[in-house]
């Protein structure tokens, strides 16, 4: 199996990033497997110059090494365009039939089909969307917790009922994004932390953007293409991406059946027919609990969590940071009855198991008393350390920026 780090270089890494990256590193190394580094810099306006290089130095300092050369999304535009063109050749009916019959894999997930709308025959798998954000906000109710807004299907109906009107708008160069039509199908998969998960694509997710109106490929398309192309089979990230996982399984199946050829194909564990199709493999998914503030909300990036540069400037060591993240993962015992202890990444590897992580699947909540107790072993003041703790959790799933932003899901 192959794991991956997938940070976004929009600034210096926070402890929240390290928490998720440690989980990914431990999962891969515990099985003796490789782990790749992918810099998710496709949304170039958000990239901070030099952040990727600093991020790599920080990972090495923490003892979280990776295998092979880093991969940069910014150098893979041609690959994403190729993937989009392949998907565009499929009709909605074709992929709906494929998804409803399941796959040849060794059961990382399964699908259950529902009843499709009467207009599905006229719907391409990839279609243009002319809706503005305001249009979608007015017609949709946001889903709780993970920022998904289910698209109401306005342009999908337009293309089915008035195809000439849609073609004319394209001919007029009207600003538009590109969406993928989702089937009335339930995706079921096993998560190492949260167990069996089920999401209906049409009702829980909807038709999501795969290329934005500014020409930038969406997170959902890029990460699915990358994981498939790089042979990633061990995916660890925050639980706010559970719903995205179902969507990415759908896109992955569509890509495979459209003829996408990975540059680093995975080898099947137990191929039924001797084939090397990329859907013959088992993929391991693990989504980590999030960390909330005292109000039960994730801290926003605008609250300026302290980064590793500030922490190291005030004396924090790699062992202290790794130890704290290992404690958050549940690797040092019950969070309610233990306090964190410094440890190296290799020491954390010695005690890592998913059983320990899944012992407590609740989101972690800031507790001032626990943090004050931990400050007793810090080489800098308790006041400074408490300030550090209160701000360090603005990012959890490899940074907030990998969570599908509103431009990606509308």
What do these predicted ranges mean?
Residues 1-144, 240, 244-260, 269, ...:
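N-terminal Rossmann-like or analogous alpha/beta NTP/dinucleotide-binding catalytic cores
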Residues 57, 82, 86, 138, ...:
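Charged/polar, solvent-exposed surface patches and flexible loops
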Residues 79, 135, 150, 320, ...:
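Exposed alpha-helical structural elements
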